[in-house]
């Protein structure tokens, strides 16, 4: 049936022929058909061009030929409004992406948004394509673009537990306090102590509360009875007197769960009774004054190594 239909529809026959050539990596046939006038920008029922097809399949040489013959990488498909660069990001095709990013269309595709507002960086972070994330940032992709739901690539990397992508994005100054401190609160809620420590070391604000209820990370630690998170948060400057929208401090939240002795409750009672020592107050203030972007430059400060280690919390028993 298909063969009979193809004989009656030369255009469909050509489309299937060049798609088969791309799938097989037959660059000779691809080039020959293009030179005979076949358009690289024709679209199938899903809105895919041959550039979408070859990028998704990982056919680098075909991508190069299509670009040489006028393929347009700004075209979005009908599935989700994705460009060929989005599909390259999805499959981690960094070399193919470089070809497109080195073209005249770079500025039009590097931050192109899908129907849901996802850029190629969102896609790469979601799928954990760390080399692709590096490539996009090398070409100056916007590091904190917002999707239609207000989500950044860093948030997607956190939610999907793409640790390498998280570190790369933070190294490129992604906003660690996005959505009023979402990242640190998420790490606390998930009891992900390694993420919690990483965000704190990089200067995440310990006292930002959720917009809906005012719960800070320390409140959430109390709710989860997570004494390790509570200790880390306190050491990095969490305020034990901050109140949520119901007027509760973290200690009050902990007591409301159960008045009996528990590790987190005992800890919060202890630190709430005793003021911080001057040394710790100075450390908190110095880190705040240095600022988020400069914390990674602590090693360059003209101070003793023991002081640098102290500012980095290397002596904390957590």
Curated annotation (Swiss-Prot):
InterPro entries linked: Ankyrin_rpt (IPR002110), Ankyrin_rpt-contain_sf (IPR036770), ASB7_SOCS (IPR037326), SOCS_box (IPR001496), SOCS_box-like_dom_sf (IPR036036)
Return the Pfam families for the record: Ank_2, SOCS_box
SMART domains the UniProt entry points to: ANK (SM00248), SOCS (SM00253), SOCS_box (SM00969)
Which keywords does this Swiss-Prot/TrEMBL entry list?
A: ANK repeat, Repeat, Ubl conjugation pathway
Q: Which Gene3D superfamilies match?
A: Ankyrin repeat-containing domain, SOCS box
Determine if Repeat is one of this entry's keywords. yes
SOCS box domain location is 265-318
Identify the PANTHER family for this entry: ANKYRIN REPEAT AND SOCS BOX CONTAINING 7, ANKYRIN REPEAT CONTAINING
Summarize subunit and interaction data from the UniProt record for this chain: Interacts with CUL5. Interacts with RNF7. Interacts with PSRC1.
Q: What does the record give as the function of this protein? A: Probable substrate-recognition component of a SCF-like ECS (Elongin-Cullin-SOCS-box protein) E3 ubiquitin-protein ligase complex which mediates the ubiquitination and subsequent proteasomal degradation of target proteins. Plays a role in spindle dynamics and genome integrity by targeting the mitotic progression protein PSRC1 for proteasomal degradation in a cell cycle-dependent manner. Also participates in meiosis by mediating the proper attachment between kinetochores and microtubules.
As for family, the record states: Belongs to the ankyrin SOCS box (ASB) family.
Q: What is this protein called?
A: Ankyrin repeat and SOCS box protein 7
Organism from which the protein derives: Homo sapiens (Human)
